[in-house]
Swiss-Prot record:
Oligomeric form and interacting partners: Homodimer or homotetramer.
Record: residues binding S-methyl-5'-thioadenosine: 34, 109, 140-141, 165
Name this protein carries in UniProt: Polyamine aminopropyltransferase
Span of the signal peptide: none
UniProtKB keywords: Cytoplasm, Polyamine biosynthesis, Spermidine biosynthesis, Transferase
Class of enzymatic activity (EC top level): transferase
GO molecular function term, any single one: spermidine synthase activity
Job of this protein: Catalyzes the irreversible transfer of a propylamine group from the amino donor S-adenosylmethioninamine (decarboxy-AdoMet) to putrescine (1,4-diaminobutane) to yield spermidine.
GO-annotated biological processes: spermidine biosynthetic process
Positions that bind spermidine: 65, 90, 158-161
Domain named PABS: residues: 5-238
Keyword set includes Nucleus: no
Length: 273
């Protein structure tokens, strides 16, 4: 990817972009599925971009990974013991799940190059893949779920936005297949984009899950390097979801966050009603 005067920019629209001053471009490759770029930035450390969009930075990755793991961890009927992660090739979600004490984690990533880049440049995140409790599978997550005959307490959709290889991860057919592999009291969670800049992604996830699951909720969090800094997640279960009192804290997550993330601004409520 070509830089302009040592700046990497993620374009949100024809009129708006977020730019990071870059000290070095560490990697730029085209895989069978997408383009991967790795930059060393002045303010956020190493930055991983896929198809020109920020996936994570060293400085704020913990926020996203705690939100996509620690919130659903506390929404299952009982403390979960197993999880399926679709996407998440950087290893961040799996690492957080290990910290939460899960006994079995299956991580299915379609693009093996994402894993290799993470092993090379984000060793703390990718260290999860060396743990015997984690089974890393390089495969299409949609196909894996379709043929899966295991049950999981948590299913985490840690994907890119609903286009390209990730488009099918927001489909009714995929959500229907998920219902067959969730254990009693289990939950599914998916990142669902910026309510401000990507309202269609949120509506797609919410309406799809709403047709198949009895209880569906949206929660949000602050992620500085994502579009608008305001990000959504959609969580669903066949059972009523009531948060269990947390016995742990993260760097971002605590008891107040668990309560507060479900308090939605009116414009977000309007999107999903």
């Amino acid at each position: 990817m070509k830089l302009i005067e040592n700046w990497f920019s993620e374009r949100y629209s024809d009129n708006l972009q977020l730019s990071f001053r870059v000290s070095d471009q560490l990697l730029s490759i085209k895989t069978d599925y997408q383009r991967i770029d790795l930059f060393d930035t002045y303010d956020f450390g190493k930055l991983l971009a896929i198809d020109g969009t920020v996936q994570l930075t060293e400085r704020d990755e913990y926020i996203y990974h705690e939100l996509i793991t620690m919130i659903p961890y506390h929404m299952t009927k009982n403390p979960p013991q197993s999880a399926l992660v679709i996407g998440g090739g950087d290893g961040g979600a799996a690492r957080r799940l290990l910290d939460l004490g899960l006994n079995k984690i299956v991580n299915v990533e379609i693009d093996g190059q994402v894993v290799e880049v993470s092993k090379r440049f984000f060793p703390d995140l990718s260290s999860a893949f060396t743990d015997k409790r984690v089974n890393l599978i390089i495969d299409d997550g949609i196909k894996y779920v379709r043929k899966c005959n295991e049950k999981f307490d948590l299913v985490i959709i840690d994907s890119t936005d609903p286009e390209g290889p990730a488009e099918g991860l927001f489909s009714m057919e995929f959500y229907s297949d998920i219902t067959k592999i969730l254990s009693d009291g289990g939950v599914i969670v998916s990142q669902s984009g910026s309510p401000f800049y990507q309202p269609k992604a949120l509506k797609l996830a919410y309406t799809g899950m709403r047709r198949l699951f009895k209880d569906v909720k949206v929660y949000t969090g602050f992620i500085p390097t994502y579009p608008s800094g305001f990000w959504s997640f959609t969580i669903a279960s066949e059972d009523a979801m009531n948060p269990r009192k947390p016995a742990i804290k993260g760097k971002y997550f605590n008891e107040d966050v668990l309560d507060g993330v479900f308090k939605l601004p009116q414009f977000v409520k309007d999107l999903i009603t």
